[in-house]
Amino acid sequence: MTQTFGENLLDAASTRGRLCVGIDPHESLLRAWGLPVDATGLAEFSRICVEAFADTVALVKPQVAFYERFGSRGFAVLEETIGTLRERGCLVVSDAKRGDIGSTMAGYATAWLDPGSPLSSDAVTVSPYLGFGSLQPVFDLAEEHGRGVFVLAATSNPEARVLQDQTDASGVSISQQIVNEAAALNAPHLAQHRAGNIGVVVGATLTDPPALSGLNGAILMPGVGTQGGTAQDVGTIAGDMAHLAFPNVSRAVLAQGPDVGNLRVAVSETAAEFPGFPRS
């Protein structure tokens, strides 16, 4: 039986903790690190991040857009970054936020989750706003290969509330519907006492988040660190799914680069802020 992404993530967390660190090589950060704003600078930035994070955190999240902006050379750097991280035992979620229908969605699924793809990752982020069912190709491939899918449910950007907080006739918000759909896909694994492959993205700064009890999948939680989310927030929102909650931090750690030692210290200090996700 193929081990699920949820199981792989819990295994990694048992030795590396429940922290996800983003690799976000945006232009201002490349400049701050004294690197050229081109594919060469991108490659050096990524190399430094791999050295700093590959053996210190459970989950690393490259932001695909910052590689895509450099075209084929950027994607070549991304391929190498993903491959090297995975070779060194670090789980990788590619933050691509893909969303489409039919054969096009199947193409995205193959690109990011098929073991034979040069971009093959442990997980990928996807957008459900063409309908949750439109994502079925990526769910199918995730189940086949034990890969993960993080579905955008309740994101931390303020613009999201006007859409994600809308409710149906029963008063259930769109974000809650997405969580419920993900939980339904994970239900067969719950019956086998295994964490499933389908996770959600839920911001750590939300005042009215969806209920996550029963999700049985990983929760990627942006909004901590620079954006103000705390361990208390993460624990309160995650509730009884806290063991599957992974706060995501990028800027607060990357600001300490480009020195590898300083980046590793920043990871250690940030992880210490989230040891047990205390709840009120």
UniProtKB/Swiss-Prot annotation:
InterPro entries assigned: Aldolase_TIM, OMPdecase_AS, OMPdecase_type-2, OMPdeCOase_dom, RibuloseP-bd_barrel
Protein's organism: Corynebacterium efficiens (strain DSM 44549 / YS-314 / AJ 12310 / JCM 11189 / NBRC 100395)
Reaction catalysed by this enzyme: orotidine 5'-phosphate + H(+) = UMP + CO2
HAMAP family assigned: OMPdecase_type2 (MF_01215)
Gene label: pyrF
NCBIfam families (UniProt xref): pyrF_sub2
Keywords, in A-Z order: Decarboxylase, Lyase, Pyrimidine biosynthesis
Family: Belongs to the OMP decarboxylase family. Type 2 subfamily.
EC number of the protein: 4.1.1.23
Gene3D superfamilies per record: Aldolase class I
UniProt GO BP: 'de novo' pyrimidine nucleobase biosynthetic process; 'de novo' UMP biosynthetic process
GO molecular function, one term: orotidine-5'-phosphate decarboxylase activity
Pfam families: OMPdecase
Active-site annotation: K97 (proton donor)
Pathway where this protein functions: Pyrimidine metabolism; UMP biosynthesis via de novo pathway; UMP from orotate: step 2/2
Name of the featured protein: Orotidine 5'-phosphate decarboxylase
